[in-house]
Amino acid sequence: MKIYLVGGAVRDSLLNLPIKDKDYLVVGATPEQMLQLGYRQVGKDFPVFLHPKNQQEYALARTERKIALGYGGFSCHASPDVTLEQDLLRRDLTINAIAQDEKGNLYDPFNGIEDINARLLRHVSDAFVEDPLRVLRVARFAARFHALGFHIAAETLALMRQISASDELNALTAERVWQEVDKSLGGPHPEVFFEVLHQCGALEVLFPEIFALFGVPQPEKWHPEIDTGVHTLMVLAQAALLTEDKSVRFAALVHDLGKALSPKEHLPKHHGHGQKGLPLIKALCTRLRVPNETRDLALLVSDQHQNVHQAFELRAETIVKIFDKADFWRKPERLTQLILACTADMRGRTGFENNPYPQGEYLTQCFLAANNVDIAAIIAAGFQGAEIKQALNLRRIEAVSQFKQKMQTKLPTDEQ
């Protein structure tokens, strides 16, 4: 029985990156032997065991055979006669198919170290096409290692296109797709994930609402990049620079879905696109089973981002209505999230990347003024029942109005 460290831990060690999880491969052992040594079996489809002391995962060497559609359509064969190389052969990328024994010796039958040095994401074998999830995984690795200069090998991208053109992607469960999206949204370059999916044809299959934005023009005055799809990924990139909040990043990604519905005769203008996008966001979130909080913020940003951009032009009554509709009184963090997404939207345009966004501070101060209205004083003044809410609303409007009067600078409208 021989034990090897495999996968991401070996790869990240060679890249001098922090190691998060360690996965081990056991060659030449049976499930019975593992149980006798105190390991606890947790894998149902194939033998995976937890170490009796540190609870790290140890998997028996195995081979796989495709028997059905989807990432789960495999028959696994685990036995003591499966070799190290046979197990590594079934892995997705060469950089993930390197093993290290207990003495520190590296085993690299598919030249993964060479590809690490060349910053290349390359498939191990043509069996790559049997697992559609690998399209998403490679896109995620491209995003994760973008700053290190990694790129996808042309022949691997060709196989990803082959998968996208088949029915395999449709066999992926919503949970697995969202899991990959969620991981990518948490990385430093989530926009690269979607760029890769667009390049290989998977975006059209899995995210048709986002795919539909590419080729849709916008006014060049406000959008020198013109293409709405390009703008969308620029906004996502800016959101990633502004915050680690994955919900804000997702909201940035889908804030302009309604622009795909603008009548061709009205292009490049997009009147009411924020509201037009709401059903598209709901459908996307339902299909992928996006968490409710993430969905709700995305809907808020789509609905209100045009108002936020034009904050200096809004009447006090309109501003308070926005605060009411979004329930910022109970969820003030939502205002911060909305402003972050709108800042990303403003900066996600060619030449606007470093511009200030005074609308954010302006709305924050409006909210503080409105939120400082003393409800106790209203009750003490003798208001009762529905009168309390009416009086509170009027005093909030007055507070915002007084703040607006103090503001001397008024920026020109910047339509997004």
From Swiss-Prot:
Cofactor: Mg(2+); Ni(2+)
Enzyme Commission number: 2.7.7.72, 3.1.3.-, 3.1.4.-
Residue numbers binding CTP: G8, R11, R91, R137, R140
Pfam families, alphabetized: HD (PF01966), PolyA_pol (PF01743), PolyA_pol_RNAbd (PF12627)
Keyword Heme tagged: no
InterPro entries found in the cross-reference section: CCA_bact, HD/PDEase_dom, HD_domain, NT_sf, PolA_pol_head_dom, PolyA_RNA-bd, tRNA_CCA-adding_enzyme
Keywords associated with the record: ATP-binding, Hydrolase, Magnesium, Metal-binding, Multifunctional enzyme, Nickel, Nucleotide-binding, Nucleotidyltransferase, RNA repair, RNA-binding, Transferase, tRNA processing
NCBIfam families: PRK10885.1
PANTHER family per record: MULTIFUNCTIONAL CCA PROTEIN
Name under which the protein is recorded: Multifunctional CCA protein
Organism lineage string: Bacteria, Pseudomonadati, Pseudomonadota, Gammaproteobacteria, Alteromonadales
